């Protein structure tokens, strides 16, 4: 990975990130964070890997005939026509297990670009490496060790561990502020990979990388699952956004690249993507009717949409008050839906009300007084009914 075809899509994704950021901020991004999952890169033959390389200004060299990647080639600045962007990857545990050669390829690319004798304003990787390695030398590391440590850009879980820790934290309500979410994200994800180093815990270095990010990215190559149907999206990408917000003190620009249609690759902001899925799926009557055909599981999945929306809001501020109001209206207040939920899965209805009330309690949603009162009524009513059922069975 990546294949020549994936390289072309990766270049398009990279160009769109840069163009979008310039249109919003008026300058090039110096540092970009990208989430790399194994399944997506297997399906797309390495599109996200290609984007990582392209942002650095490095292209793969392919073996004639087999098209296997056999090396790397620096794209000259005259050809690139832009600065080399510094890229940090948060890899999944499965990516670590299934793509060790790709991790080493990306690590080599960073080291290659860092060694180039180029103007620092044309090579942000070198700019950051020079500054960070000097700091590490001042802390007592040798020049060689300081350079190596400053150059780590591939981070993930320690060996044998999977996940980002964020979903469990939010589900358990075990947090008070964005700083708590960031702390968990760093603790789980600050294990560096590259060369002979396989999972060295470097929280200070990972925090520095997160605190420098101008942009965060997670790309999608299909619509089978999305950021509201699974909590993994928020755990990895939302967690990264939360880390930047906490450490840097301001939110990054955050994008979702969509390459489901290879002829029309598009780049949405996280907020735009959340609203797109919210309108087209979550509150779409056809979607709700479809879920109602699946009984207990359909009800549980609907509750998950509310939960994942709330979790995204906690990390990335993607929800607006009207969206929470719509969830309350369409999922919990609608007589037909409410009756069905009470029949097939009252626990899901109780969870929906509980999450919506938590969003209000945490200040993520300024609920209308009548909406809040109705949600409290539903929660207590279902709780009473479930207690009666429990008493009958005991």
Language model: regions and residue ranges:
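Ligand/cofactor-recognition surfaces for anionic moieties
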Residues: 1-394
């Amino acid at each position: 990975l990546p294949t020549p075809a994936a390289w072309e899509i990766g270049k398009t994704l990279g160009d769109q990130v840069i163009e979008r950021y310039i249109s919003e901020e008026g300058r090039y991004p110096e540092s970009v964070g990208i989430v790399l999952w194994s399944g997506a890169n297997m399906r797309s033959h390495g599109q996200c890997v290609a984007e990582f390389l392209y942002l650095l200004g490095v292209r793969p060299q392919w073996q004639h005939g087999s098209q296997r990647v056999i090396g790397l080639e620096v794209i000259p600045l005259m050809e690139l026509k832009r600065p080399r962007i510094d890229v940090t990857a948060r890899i999944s545990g499965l990516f670590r297990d299934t793509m060790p050669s790709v991790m080493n390829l990306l690590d080599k690319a960073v080291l290659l670009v860092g060694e180039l004798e180029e103007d620092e304003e044309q090579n942000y990787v070198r700019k950051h490496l020079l500054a960070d390695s000097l700091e590490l030398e001042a802390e007592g590391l040798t020049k060689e060790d300081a350079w190596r440590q400053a150059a780590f850009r591939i981070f993930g879980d320690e060996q044998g561990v999977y996940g980002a820790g964020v979903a469990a934290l939010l589900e358990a309500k075990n947090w008070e502020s964005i700083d708590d979410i960031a702390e968990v994200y760093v603790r789980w994800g600050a294990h560096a990979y590259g060369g002979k180093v396989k999972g060295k815990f470097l929280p200070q270095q990972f925090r520095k990388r997160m605190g420098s990010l101008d942009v965060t990215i997670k790309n999608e190559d299909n619509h089978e699952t999305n950021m509201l149907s699974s909590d993994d999206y928020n755990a990895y990408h939302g967690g990264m956004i939360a880390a930047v917000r906490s450490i840097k003190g301001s939110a990054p620009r955050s994008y979702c690249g969509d390459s489901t249609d290879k002829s029309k690759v598009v780049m949405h902001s996280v907020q735009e993507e959340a609203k797109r899925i919210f309108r087209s799926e979550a509150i779409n009557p056809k979607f709700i009717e479809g879920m109602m055909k699946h009984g207990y599981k359909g009800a549980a999945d609907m509750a998950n949409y509310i939960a994942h929306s709330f979790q995204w809001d906690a990390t990335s501020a993607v929800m607006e008050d009207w969206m929470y109001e719509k969830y309350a209206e369409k999922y919990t207040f609608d007589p037909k839906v409410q009756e069905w939920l009470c029949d097939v899965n009252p626990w899901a209805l109780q969870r929906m009300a509980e999450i919506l009330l938590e969003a209000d309690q945490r200040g993520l949603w300024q609920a209308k007084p009548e909406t809040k009162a109705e949600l409290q009524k539903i929660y207590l009513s279902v709780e009473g009914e479930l207690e009666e059922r429990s008493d009958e069975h005991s």
